[in-house]
Amino acid sequence: MQMTTRVLTGITPSGTPHLGNYVGAIRPAIQASTATDAESFYFLADLHSLIKAQDPARTQRSTLEIAASWLACGLDPDKVWFYRQSDVPETTELMWLLTCVAGKGILNRAHAYKAAMDKNRAEGEDEDAGVTAGLFMYPVLMAADILIFNAHKVPVGRDQIQHIEMARDFAQRFNHVYGQDYFTLPDAVIDEQVATLPGLDGRKMSKSYNNTIPLFAPREELRKLVFSILTDSRAPGEAKDTQGSALFQLYQAFATPQETAAFAQAFADGISWADAKQQLFERIDLEIAPLRARYEALMAEPAKIEATLRAGGARLRARYATPLLAQLRDAVGLRDLSSQASAVGPATAVKAALPVFKQYRESDGQFYFKLHDAAGTLLLQSDGFASPREAGQLIARLKQAEDTTQLQLPGVQLPADAAPVLAALRALREA
């Protein structure tokens, strides 16, 4: 039976989103949440937000607004896992367990931490000025978010790929130190076609440019903002270019292909900017009006949102987080002292039941793996690899090997007698 793919999406609680957030992130994520071949996890990263936001009222308000936004846009908490990061305390306990195997050198190379230090040096400040331990440890908390549910895939932007690689590294280190594959190694999913919208001034829509159109702006405010979009001086009756037109790009993001083609023809026919803006306003409002109504209803009943988030967290803890933490606590030795004598025998027996691949990182920075048989005898040793993914891909190929020729792969130190290796691989396939 094939395992369902678990997909984890983190949501930054940054308040009410704008149209660019909706088109580029929220709408496609909610569409993806309906996939029947995946188990989807969506969480509000309120603990992460504390790294930058230290205004309690703002943190609370932003969390409420972003939760209401996603629910209003169609996220169904009965079909996906929707929860608040701080409602799953096992995440922070796991963070500590990972911290105890994470290399400080890896954290030193984290982009956000390095950027903060570089900025301080450029300004003549002490390189750690204003840099909190929270910023430094951010990648470990992100790894815990992913590994607490053993997510297989994590949709991220290119600037977050490093954090997924770190999560893989921490997971491999833990698996190696404690001799068992407790964690699945997650993969980053990069959407190369992320939609971006132009703002009121033609630049990318961004709060930092102060050129946004709030997603749930009241109807009249929405109309006013649309009519303030920057256009050129071409008069009614004069053909207008769709290329580079913020007005046209915004319309295209909400319209069907047929509607877009008709709008393009209207540009060629010399539609006035006022009429074009009116059409854009009506097309956006057609999609947004029902979402706005749901958002306003949700914001009027914050207790319902609170109940939804708490219920999601409670169900997740029971299903995934609590059982995994119990297993991990036992693995590291945080055990009931009265059961010490009886626990040693069975644990050893279970551990020795099957052959096992062990992945690890050496001091040279390279990633290696070994194959041991059920008794712990070393059967196979790899060469070093530049990334954990390369090592993992080779292990996957080895697990399918059924004869000696299939074992002859670059990066594998094959023993003279390959029969024990093939027997071990067969045992793993049949397990």
From Swiss-Prot:
<keyword id="KW-0963">Cytoplasm</keyword>
<dbReference type="GO" id="GO:0005524">
    <property type="term" value="F:ATP binding"/>
</dbReference>
<dbReference type="InterPro" id="IPR002305">
    <property type="entry name" value="aa-tRNA-synth_Ic"/>
</dbReference>
<dbReference type="InterPro" id="IPR024109">
    <property type="entry name" value="Trp-tRNA-ligase_bac-type"/>
</dbReference>
<dbReference type="GO" id="GO:0006436">
    <property type="term" value="P:tryptophanyl-tRNA aminoacylation"/>
</dbReference>
<feature type="short sequence motif" description="'KMSKS' region">
    <location>
        <begin position="204"/>
        <end position="208"/>
    </location>
</feature>
<protein>
    <recommendedName>
        <fullName>Tryptophan--tRNA ligase</fullName>
        <ecNumber>6.1.1.2</ecNumber>
    </recommendedName>
</protein>
<feature type="binding site">
    <location>
        <position position="145"/>
    </location>
    <ligand>
        <name>L-tryptophan</name>
    </ligand>
</feature>
<dbReference type="InterPro" id="IPR014729">
    <property type="entry name" value="Rossmann-like_a/b/a_fold"/>
</dbReference>
<dbReference type="InterPro" id="IPR002306">
    <property type="entry name" value="Trp-tRNA-ligase"/>
</dbReference>
<feature type="binding site">
    <location>
        <begin position="20"/>
        <end position="21"/>
    </location>
    <ligand>
        <name>ATP</name>
    </ligand>
</feature>
<dbReference type="GO" id="GO:0004830">
    <property type="term" value="F:tryptophan-tRNA ligase activity"/>
</dbReference>
<dbReference type="GO" id="GO:0005829">
    <property type="term" value="C:cytosol"/>
</dbReference>
<keyword id="KW-0547">Nucleotide-binding</keyword>
<keyword id="KW-0067">ATP-binding</keyword>
<feature type="binding site">
    <location>
        <begin position="204"/>
        <end position="208"/>
    </location>
    <ligand>
        <name>ATP</name>
    </ligand>
</feature>
<keyword id="KW-0030">Aminoacyl-tRNA synthetase</keyword>
<keyword id="KW-0648">Protein biosynthesis</keyword>
<dbReference type="InterPro" id="IPR001412">
    <property type="entry name" value="aa-tRNA-synth_I_CS"/>
</dbReference>
<comment type="function">
    <text>Catalyzes the attachment of tryptophan to tRNA(Trp).</text>
</comment>
<feature type="binding site">
    <location>
        <begin position="12"/>
        <end position="14"/>
    </location>
    <ligand>
        <name>ATP</name>
    </ligand>
</feature>
<comment type="subunit">
    <text>Homodimer.</text>
</comment>
<dbReference type="InterPro" id="IPR036913">
    <property type="entry name" value="YegP-like_sf"/>
</dbReference>
<dbReference type="Pfam" id="PF00579">
    <property type="entry name" value="tRNA-synt_1b"/>
</dbReference>
<dbReference type="InterPro" id="IPR050203">
    <property type="entry name" value="Trp-tRNA_synthetase"/>
</dbReference>
<feature type="binding site">
    <location>
        <position position="197"/>
    </location>
    <ligand>
        <name>ATP</name>
    </ligand>
</feature>
<comment type="similarity">
    <text>Belongs to the class-I aminoacyl-tRNA synthetase family.</text>
</comment>
<feature type="binding site">
    <location>
        <begin position="157"/>
        <end position="159"/>
    </location>
    <ligand>
        <name>ATP</name>
    </ligand>
</feature>
<keyword id="KW-0436">Ligase</keyword>
<feature type="short sequence motif" description="'HIGH' region">
    <location>
        <begin position="13"/>
        <end position="21"/>
    </location>
</feature>
